[in-house]
Amino acid sequence: MAQLWGGRFTKETDQLVYNFNASIGFDQKFYRQDIQGSMAHVKMLARQGILTEEEKDKILEGLQGILDDVENHRLEITSEYEDIHSFVEANLIERIGDAGKKLHTGRSRNDQVALDMKLYIRDEIREMDGLLLELLKTLQKIMEENLHTYMPGFTHLQKAQPITLAHHMGAYFEMFRRDRGRLYDIYRRMNFCPLGSGALAGTTYPLDREYTAELLAFEAATRNSMDSVSDRDYLIELLSAMSTIMMHLSRFCEEIIIWNTNEYQFVEIDDAYSTGSSIMPQKKNPDIAELVRGKTGRVYGALMSMLTTMKGLPLAYNKDMQEDKELTFDAIDTVKGCLALFTGMLSTMRFQKDRMEESAKNGFTNATDAADYLVGKGVPFRDAHGIVGRLVLYCLEKKIALDDMTLEEYQKISPVFGEDIYEAISMKNCVEKRNTIGAPGADAMRRVLEENRRYLEEEKF
């Protein structure tokens, strides 16, 4: 058992207790960040005269050697160590001797792990941001190619009004754009360095916390040492933001699953992103979309676990907080995997454009435009609404669409109808005359696409 404490104990730790308490099985995930933080700490200690330049150089060389050996698989992180901190320190002392014993001067594992987690989360946020950016670029491409691909828009899963595929994809563009914004907000709010806070009450050593923060690219040092070691707000915020990302992916997947059915046939998922059945040879299943939808609950669960863990903890650090890592790591890996797979599936998906437009025509999605036509002829909207309701009922009885009615049939229900009704309710006209901000008309969508292009070129981090 390699651990960083034990002087005041008269007995060896029970093996079951040691195993239960140890975190090396999961906190080894941020070995790189642990070494990065230690390097900055050592440079600061030397700058403040707490370490000599010779000691600093020796420790830095030893830390770099550990990092290189781990990354090149020459050194294995094993369960004989309690945590990643003890692994690094024990190996450092073994390599460079007594100088390595000075690494932890002016530092506690409480502020050390708080730093490691923040460094790790910063890296992961940047990675997730890159994955969201690729998804947004994929959506932008689909939008640009489908300004005139008409389809039904839905409310209550029933056909409502005609829109375009570009407009539908644009709704998801907005969702994932907001997701990027949330990640950026979390990054900005958490970007303060906790190192130097000690166990909870700072330290008597003359540490330069601002210098350490600068070395590690933080905005500044944290302002309260107790909060620094017990703050997990940024993890709760991240898990909430990731839950929202997964909710958006899940909604999108649900639509793809529906659109992929024989009853809709709006899309065909590429073979590379589909699976079959062990008994039914005809099956081509949307398993990726279903798994993304299913994994959403897993990320929600991590958020609820984190909230529950933190809800009753008095200041400052408590061992309960060790539970933050496994669930956060798992949620991050889940979200990144889902984003990458979903983007691949979406970019290879084939949209059945003719089927989409035919579905819009057969679902009375132009009924609102028929009512608007009557309003334009001077009929009060409430009366127009009732007239078109009778038109729809007539079409249902005859099993025809509004476009299929003769002018004589129209005029039997209302003499206000003229030959121009057919142009008024054409799919193209229904969509293209809607050009206010946020509407599906091509002119409105071109403005959106241009703004999207500028947005996609911006640097977030």
Task: Label each PLM-derived region with a short phrase.
Residues I50-L51, L75, Y264-Q265, P380, ...:
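Conserved hydrophobic residue
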Residues H41-L51, T164-H167, I236-T244, D369-G378:
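Short, well-ordered beta-strand elements within core beta-sheets of diverse protein domains
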Residues A2-G37, D98-A99, M280-F461:
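Glycine-rich cofactor/substrate-binding loops
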Residues S38, I66, M128, L132-L135, ...:
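Amphipathic alpha-helices that form helix-helix packing interfaces
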Residues E127, L131, L157, Q161-A171, ...:
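Short, contiguous, pocket-lining structural segments
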Residues L216-T308:
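Acidic, glycine-rich loop-and-beta core segments that form the ion-binding/anion-interacting portion
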Residues M1-G202, L207-E214, A220, T275-G276, ...:
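A helix-coil-helix interface module used to build multimeric assemblies
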Residues E145, R182-D185, R189, F218-T222, ...:
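Conserved helix-loop functional segments at active or binding sites
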